[in-house]
């Protein structure tokens, strides 16, 4: 293994440029009922790997066209349009009065350099030859990382490539919203004078049903889940989609196929008792259900999703054909409009946003349709993206894309313990 040194050259806050007008310094922005879900006050971390573009040369200190310098300047400009990302959280989530104060304090930005090329570390493929801790930004000692809405670290490599480490607090934006902000930074980095999508803050557009009495606190038991990643070709996914259409006369998505396979493989590998209920949960975008109130041109970047939970007994998930498991998931997705409408009108007795983190719940996140893979700071789109949406008390599967030029779906999981990992891997490998 190559010995690699990552040196952080500067660490400081980047404020809006031009600076926030004095009249707005103390502006307080209301959060929506979804933003205020206590479970969303956590950091979403990811690494975005950009290979050397054919027209770019080696990184040279003092060059104003270095990725770190360009992105830093663009970030400052973007914060002028997105002042909440330069602000700070105030109030209490538990009390229901959390807000964002537009203080202009800025986003945390780190410039770093690695003494190797991306090829020397295998393009940052798994297993990672540079730890995530070295490539992700961390605030100064004693500072709560969830108190800063967004943090970035740009690590430049000797080949001209770079890795952008992004840490964003989920309270402020969902995946689509975070990608919208990063896209704005990229557009300004490429020299655009005006953002293609104007940001919309107005959180009053989101339904605000009566608050339900709090249930029992969630369990945060550590399970020791192991990481496993595999790539599924586009042809394999297309074959399953065709089979599903022939069987049920309906279309299914790549998400449906990949989620069903992971759910089935995990259920088989763990060996749950046949009668045990197993669940798969994912955050479904609900912007299309709020078209009457959200701007027609888009731009709303707050949390706008609904947690869809699909439930079946372990015996069905483990023993039925994959196509049948896909149908279970699709039937659950079909209930989204009705369930979201009931929640919005206050016609629910259990808060769907109060998540539980039990062993029999698999959380799935799809990163392929958020917009991160289309971001271009001037050196082309990312070669690949590594999300770190893992917590040891959550069984997680993340859908992404394999490094270019490969096609297909990358399934990144952390959902079974070491004692079950081989059987899980065998189940997944048999599928591909």
From Swiss-Prot:
EC top class, as a word: transferase
Keywords: Acyltransferase, Transferase
E.C. number: 2.3.1.-
Gene Ontology terms, MF aspect: hydroxycinnamoyltransferase activity
Pfam family, one: Transferase
Record: active site: 170 (proton acceptor), 376 (proton acceptor)
Miscellaneous: Plants over-expressing AT5 have significant increase of ferulate in leaf cell wall.
The protein's role, per its UniProt record: Involved in the incorporation of ferulate into the cell wall. May act as arabinoxylan feruloyl transferase.
The family this protein is said to belong to: Belongs to the plant acyltransferase family.
Protein name: Acyl transferase 5
Organism: Oryza sativa subsp. japonica
Origin organism lineage: Eukaryota, Viridiplantae, Streptophyta, Embryophyta, Tracheophyta
Gene designation per UniProt: AT5
């Amino acid at each position: 293994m190559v010995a690699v040194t990552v040196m952080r050259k500067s660490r400081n806050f980047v404020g809006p440029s031009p600076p926030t007008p004095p009249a707005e310094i103390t502006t307080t922005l209301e959060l929506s009922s979804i933003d205020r879900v206590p479970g969303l006050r956590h950091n979403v971390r990811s690494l975005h790997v950009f290979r050397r573009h054919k027209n770019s040369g080696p990184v040279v200190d003092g060059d104003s066209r270095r990725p770190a310098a360009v992105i830093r300047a663009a970030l400052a400009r973007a914060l002028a349009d997105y002042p909440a990302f330069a602000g700070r959280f105030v109030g209490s989530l538990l009390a229901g009065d959390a807000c964002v104060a537009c203080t202009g304090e800025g986003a945390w930005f780190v410039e770093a350099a690695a003494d190797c090329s991306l090829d020397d570390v295998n393009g940052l493929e798994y297993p990672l030859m540079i730890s995530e801790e070295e490539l992700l930004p961390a605030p100064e000692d004693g500072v709560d990382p969830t108190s800063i809405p967004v943090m970035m670290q740009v690590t430049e490599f000797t080949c001209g490539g770079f890795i952008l480490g992004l840490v964003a607090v989920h309270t402020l934006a969902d995946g689509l919203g975070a990608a919208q902000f990063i896209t704005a930074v990229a557009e300004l980095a490429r020299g655009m004078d005006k953002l293609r999508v104007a940001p919309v803050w107005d959180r009053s557009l989101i339904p605000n049903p009566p608050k339900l009495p709090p249930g029992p606190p969630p369990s945060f038991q550590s399970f020791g889940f192991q990481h496993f990643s595999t790539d599924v070709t586009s042809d394999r996914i297309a074959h399953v989609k065709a089979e599903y259409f022939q069987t049920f006369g309906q279309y299914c998505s790549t998400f449906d196929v990949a989620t069903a396979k992971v759910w089935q493989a995990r259920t088989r590998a763990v060996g749950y008792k046949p009668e045990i209920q197993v669940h798969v949960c994912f955050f479904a975008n609900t912007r299309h259900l709020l078209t009457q109130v959200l701007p027609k041109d888009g731009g709303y970047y707050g949390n706008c999703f609904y947690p869809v939970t699909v439930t079946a007994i372990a015996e069905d998930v483990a023993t039925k054909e994959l196509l049948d498991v896909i149908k279970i998931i699709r039937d659950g997705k079909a209930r989204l409009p009705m369930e979201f409408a009931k929640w919005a009108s206050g016609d629910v007795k259990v808060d769907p946003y109060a998540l539980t983190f039990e062993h029999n719940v698999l959380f799935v996140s799809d990163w392929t349709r958020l917009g991160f893979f289309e971001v271009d700071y001037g050196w082309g789109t990312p070669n690949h993206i590594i999300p770190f949406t893992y917590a040891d008390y959550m069984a997680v599967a993340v859908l992404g894309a394999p490094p270019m030029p490969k096609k297909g779906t990358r399934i990144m999981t952390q959902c079974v313990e070491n004692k079950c990992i081989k059987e899980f891997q065998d189940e997944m490998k048999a599928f591909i």
